[in-house]
Amino acid sequence: MWDQRLVKLALLQHLRAFYGIKVKGVRGQCDRRRHETAATEIGGKIFGVPFNALPHSAVPEYGHIPSFLVDACTSLEEHIHTEGLFRKSGSVIRLKALKNKVDHGEGCLSSAPPCDIAGLLKQFFRELPEPILPADLHEALLKAQQLGTEEKNKAILLLSCLLADHTVHVLRYFFNFLRNVSLRSSENKMDSSNLAVIFAPNLLQTSEGHEKMSSNAEKKGVYQTLSWKRYQPCWVLMVSVLLHHWKALKKVNMKLLVNIREREDNV
């Protein structure tokens, strides 16, 4: 049984030594459990609510996933052939009414237009109190984009090992769903690149002029902001990597674990 704190420390050291990526202030699972105490205050709301305070459904192979996400993806699977799914906007009025019904516990997704469900799904991620790809990893993820293709992919997947387990479960489930959408791109015109363009700003919750980099990074002149407009290609490419390698999320290379054990034994 590996000591999770030791694994995390080794990952941070490995990222810094081999890729020049420094990660600071990453919050662990225990810190995120504070959201559970808010469950009683939230009531039945779905939007703007932390994952841990939402109703969950057990999904084989993925674990416990927010029930709304499961219901939305299941409903959209029936319309996966729809051209422009996620790209075409639904009715603003219908979307607002649909969101209100969902927040009041009404099971209405099965009868809603697919474009409305798709719009609601994007809004769900966009309104999370914290982005599913946490802000304290944004700088490191952006730094990884400067690496060569193979090294970049390895670095991004190693960074995924710093995510909380429940976050990884949701990402694996959702990225597998998006993969299924992309497999029908001959009909829906939504390949993995198009999906990455659409979901990157929702998963990262980035916006123009939003979120300053650390003062350390500013001094080095690496980047001044994490604005969506300026770094759109980087964010889209990063989401594309996660989409293509969703099965490998939070799976630490065994060779790295052996190095961890050797380091522990030599202490």
Curated annotation (Swiss-Prot):
- One Gene Ontology biological process: cerebral cortex development
Q: Which GO terms describe its cellular component?
A: cytosol; mitochondrial matrix
- Keywords carried by this UniProt record: GTPase activation, Mitochondrion, Transit peptide
Identify the Gene3D superfamilies for this entry: Rho GTPase activation protein
The UniProt entry lists the main location of this chain as mitochondrion
InterPro entries reported in the protein's UniProt record: ARHGAP11A/B, Rho_GTPase_activation_prot, RhoGAP_dom
> Whom does it interact with, and what assembly results?
Interacts with ADP:ATP translocase components SLC25A4/ANT1 and SLC25A5/ANT2.
PANTHER family attached here?
A: RHO GTPASE ACTIVATING PROTEIN 11A (PTHR15670), RHO GTPASE-ACTIVATING PROTEIN 11A (PTHR15670:SF4)
Keyword Transcription appears in the UniProt entry? no
In alphabetical order, the GO MF annotations are:
GTPase activator activity
Pfam entry (one): RhoGAP
Q: Which organism is it from?
A: Homo sapiens
User: Positions of the site: Arginine finger?
Assistant: R87
User: What gene, per UniProt, encodes this protein?
Assistant: ARHGAP11B
The entry's localization annotation reads: Mitochondrion matrix
Record's protein name: Inactive Rho GTPase-activating protein 11B
Cite any additional comment in the entry: When expressed in embryonic mouse neocortex, promotes basal progenitor generation and self-renewal, and can increase cortical plate area and induce gyrification. Mice exhibit increased neocortical size and upper-layer neuron numbers persisting into adulthood. Moreover, mice display altered neurobehaviour, characterized by an increased memory flexibility and a reduced anxiety level. ARHGAP11B arose from partial duplication of ARHGAP11A on the human lineage after separation from the chimpanzee lineage, but before the divergence from Neandertals.
